[in-house]
């Protein structure tokens, strides 16, 4: 039986978790449509939760995290995914309760996979990952309502994966982007991504009048939630 290596989190006693690289057999994977040899994965916040024993994300351990993966199909039960095709898997249950991308192999339903576009390298697909997919869907939702060129847009949680990609894409599409962050040493990083203005999170919260402030933003992408989201909602144009 073919062996492979995987990152595995194990519950050694109640609410105590260790992690290590382990040798696994293909028989350890769930039986499914596609057996994929993983080339790259990416690191998401949900992966960190799973890897450290958060049972709201992963119910049973031992477990291999990794909610994103790209790789080559080695076995297939679906003619739309021939052997040696390059595929991307993001989301669904991968890395949550199904062994994930922090492994040399995954086995998943074909409905979870998409053929990787030829113009996108495997490494680039995981650089984008779930964070980039989420940012892209947010921007598409804005585009469905209005043209992005010239609008005033605000992005919270701007140094994170979703936030930073949103800042870069909105700027590239011609929006005037304001980035909100709690990280004082990241202002130049956000300006380099294309933000015209960077506001400290606490300063932003103090500057907004509630319940209804002055309408400043044509669109917003919020990652932070809580008070930040409330303040954004108060200062949107309606």
Regions inferred by a protein language model and the residue ranges of each:
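NAD(P)H dinucleotide-binding glycine-rich loop of Rossmann-like/cofactor-binding domains
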Residues: 18, 90-157
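Short structural boundary motif marking the start of a folded domain
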Residues: 2-7, 34
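Cytochrome P450 core scaffold surrounding the K-helix E-X-X-R motif
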Residues: 46-51
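Mid-domain Rossmann-like dinucleotide-binding core that forms the NAD(H)/NADP(H) cofactor-binding site
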Residues: 126-203
């Amino acid at each position: 039986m073919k062996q492979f290596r995987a990152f595995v989190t194990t519950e050694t006693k109640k609410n105590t978790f260790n992690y290590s690289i382990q040798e696994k057999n293909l028989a350890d994977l769930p039986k499914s449509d596609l057996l994929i040899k993983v080339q790259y994965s990416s690191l998401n916040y949900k992966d960190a939760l799973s890897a450290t024993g958060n049972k709201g994300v992963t119910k049973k351990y031992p477990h291999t995290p990794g909610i994103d993966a790209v790789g080559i199909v080695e076995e297939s039960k679906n003619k739309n995914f021939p052997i040696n095709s390059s595929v991307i898997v993001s989301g669904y249950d991968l890395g949550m309760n199904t062994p994930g991308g922090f492994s040399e192999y995954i086995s998943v339903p074909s409905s979870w996979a998409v053929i990787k576009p030829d113009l996108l390298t495997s490494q680039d697909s995981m650089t984008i990952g779930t964070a980039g997919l989420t940012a892209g869907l947010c921007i598409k939702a804005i585009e469905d309502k209005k043209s992005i060129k010239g609008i005033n847009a605000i992005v919270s949680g701007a140094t994170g994966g979703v936030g930073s990609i949103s800042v870069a894409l909105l700027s590239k599409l011609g929006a005037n982007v304001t980035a909100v962050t709690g990280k004082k040493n990241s202002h130049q990083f956000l300006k380099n991504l294309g933000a015209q203005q960077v506001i400290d999170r606490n300063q932003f919260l103090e500057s907004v009048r509630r319940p209804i402030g002055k309408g400043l933003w044509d669109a917003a992408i919020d990652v932070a939630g809580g008070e930040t989201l409330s303040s954004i909602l108060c200062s949107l144009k309606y």
